[in-house]
Amino acid sequence: MNEIRNIESDPIYRNRLANMLVDRILKNGKKSLAYQIFYQAMKRIRQKTNRNPLSVLRQAVRGVTPDVVTETKRVGGSTYRVPIEVVPAKGKALAIRWLLIACRKRSGRSMALRLSDELIDAARNSGSAIRKKEETHKVAEANKAFAHFR
């Protein structure tokens, strides 16, 4: 059976959620660069909002975490999008993935600036990641009739 890997906490904030985000920022094994981007984004969040950046991060992830997603099921030659409730760990992972996809799609500037802007927007219940969650919920709502295929 799949074992859930133990997630360490990051060195400065001592927070698992922060480390999950850093692990997803990571590209080509450059973890020190990923930490640098994350800490610059956190510093900018503190400057822009005058709030604890970790609380902004938690609020952003909580806001983007989906309640339901759709899974594709094939039944008798037809394909259905079946709505399924999300397990909290998977929801958090999806939220982090969507936040990073949204900030990578933002135009120009450095990754730290885009990440901080996206996290602030998500904490305020706006931004691309929030739209992705709402879109996912709409698709699940539209396919509610197929819930019995679970």
UniProtKB/Swiss-Prot annotation:
Localization annotation: Plastid, Chloroplast
GO MF annotation terms: rRNA binding; structural constituent of ribosome
Keywords carried by this UniProt record: Chloroplast, Plastid, Ribonucleoprotein, Ribosomal protein, RNA-binding, rRNA-binding
Major localisation: plastid
Pfam families: Ribosomal_S7 (PF00177)
Classification via HAMAP family: Ribosomal_uS7_B (MF_00480_B)
Role played: One of the primary rRNA binding proteins, it binds directly to 16S rRNA where it nucleates assembly of the head domain of the 30S subunit.
Subunit annotation: Part of the 30S ribosomal subunit.
Protein's recorded name: Small ribosomal subunit protein uS7cz/uS7cy
